[in-house]
Amino acid sequence: MDSSCLNATTKMLATAPARGNVMSTSKPLAFSIERIMARTPEPKALPVPHFLQGAVPKGDPKHSLHLNSSIPCMIPFVPVAYDTNSKAGVNGSEPRKASLEVPAPPAVAPSAPAFSCSDLLNCALSLKGDLARDALPLQQYKLVRPRVVNHSSFHAMGALCYLNRGDGPCHPAASVNIHPVASYFLSSPLHPQPKTYLAERNKLVVPAVEKLPSGVAFKDLSQAQLQHYMKESAQLLSEKIAFKTSDFSRGSPNAKPKVFTCEVCGKVFNAHYNLTRHMPVHTGARPFVCKVCGKGFRQASTLCRHKIIHTQEKPHKCNQCGKAFNRSSTLNTHTRIHAGYKPFVCEFCGKGFHQKGNYKNHKLTHSGEKQFKCNICNKAFHQVYNLTFHMHTHNDKKPFTCPTCGKGFCRNFDLKKHVRKLHDSSLGLTRTPTGEPSSDPPPQLQQPPPAPLPPLQPTLPPPGPLPSGLHQGHQ
């Protein structure tokens, strides 16, 4: 047998209990539960505020809480001072300790009424009169950074604690569900109808006031209610407790600005990238050029949409008239024509439009200002595309040619009107619902049959004496 196995067997026999007649010598254990528990360090806790020191009467915490065991309450807030004069947050660092000034509690009048928390939270914490009302001027404090704090150092706080966070001014004595210790963790003044935060261990439950009334113990809630409150707490914490970092950073002098303004037109953007995309509107730069037709665009996305025109693909087809389009957005706009839907209405004349672009161009006609002027003949126009078509008259550029007669036009609209009026009528062509010409002859209207003519009557000579020649011949 190996020596290592022999040593292990010897140790096992030495520590094993006596069985039957076999006697073994017991050795003292190298560890003990008492020594392990004695070496367990106590959790570090924040010092108790001086206005709470001595306010808790001596006694058994378990008896005051009516609990069989003391469960530490974990509150995810740390009290941090906020100096209203210098607007500088204090988190306990040495250079900023000077602005953390907790005023001393005023003298308690002998006849002042006592405020006891034993009926609310069973923590046996009592404050008297003005001390309970003015123990902490909440307007001078503001929450800067949340942190999980083991507040077992507060005497007999127990497993149940209510945190109150509101938006309006209210003294702790004016609302029955406000705890003076919890007020120390507030970030804003209290409200007469506040939201209640139920904290038990590391689980934070944020129910609404109407769903969980004040004074309800944690043990009285069902498991379904707790799960429901836990789900609701996630959104509320992210919105309201997650915690004013934007407000705090906005007040910092070193915070980066979140507003970017165009120096030319004054338009505001929330990102520098959007401002960069906007600047070509003023500079006229069109860095994105189509390789097929050479047309330039300010944005790459506009160029991508333009490339579909050259593919001659029109996958989006109208179900009513059969007309096809390159983009689905164009089809959606086209369907407004069949539905008679004109969402863009002119404020001046009441005329409606299917498209927003046509609506904007129409409004320029009411302004009376023609800011687009021709450099050659000084003719002015309301809209820029009218000036573009007008420039073709000076350079004799007519890109749209009639395939029948060869006549050129500056606009495609004029070409279609020319074909519809001249060639379709002369060739007997009609337009189908899709807009394509058809060789079928146009239907002829049925005319009523002509009225019957009256019968012809023979014409007789008028009565009178016959001529002499005719009279003699008969004789």
Swiss-Prot record:
Stated name of the protein: Fez family zinc finger protein 1
Keywords, ordered alphabetically: Developmental protein, Differentiation, DNA-binding, Metal-binding, Neurogenesis, Nucleus, Repeat, Repressor, Transcription, Transcription regulation, Zinc, Zinc-finger
Family: Belongs to the krueppel C2H2-type zinc-finger protein family.
Pfam family, one: zf-C2H2_6
Zinc finger annotations (C2H2-type) as residue ranges: 260-282, 288-310, 316-338, 344-366, 372-394, 400-423
Region (Disordered): 425-475
Source organism, top-level taxon: Eukaryota
Residue interval(s) of motif Engrailed homology 1 repressor: 28-43
PANTHER family given in the database record: ZINC FINGER PROTEIN, ZINC FINGER PROTEIN 771
KW DNA-binding (keyword) present: yes
Pro residues bias: start-end ranges: 439-466
Biased composition annotated in UniProt, kind: Polar residues: 427-437
Deletion consequences: Null mutants were born alive but most of them died within one day. The olfactory bulbs were smaller than those of their wild-type at 18.5 dpc and at postnatal day 1. At 14.5 dpc and 18 dpc no abnormalities in the morphology of the telencephalon or diencephalon were detected. There seems to be a redundant role for FEZF1 and FEZF2 in diencephalon development.
GO biological process assignments: axon guidance; cell dedifferentiation; central nervous system neuron differentiation; forebrain anterior/posterior pattern specification; forebrain development; interneuron migration; negative regulation of cell population proliferation; negative regulation of transcription by RNA polymerase II
Role this protein plays: Transcription repressor. Involved in the axonal projection and proper termination of olfactory sensory neurons (OSN). Plays a role in rostro-caudal patterning of the diencephalon and in prethalamic formation. Expression is required in OSN to cell-autonomously regulate OSN axon projections. Regulates non-cell-autonomously the layer formation of the olfactory bulb development and the interneurons. May be required for correct rostral migration of the interneuron progenitors.
Subcellular location: Nucleus
One GO CC term on file: cytosol
One Gene Ontology MF term: RNA polymerase II cis-regulatory region sequence-specific DNA binding
InterPro entries: Znf_C2H2_sf (IPR036236), Znf_C2H2_type (IPR013087)
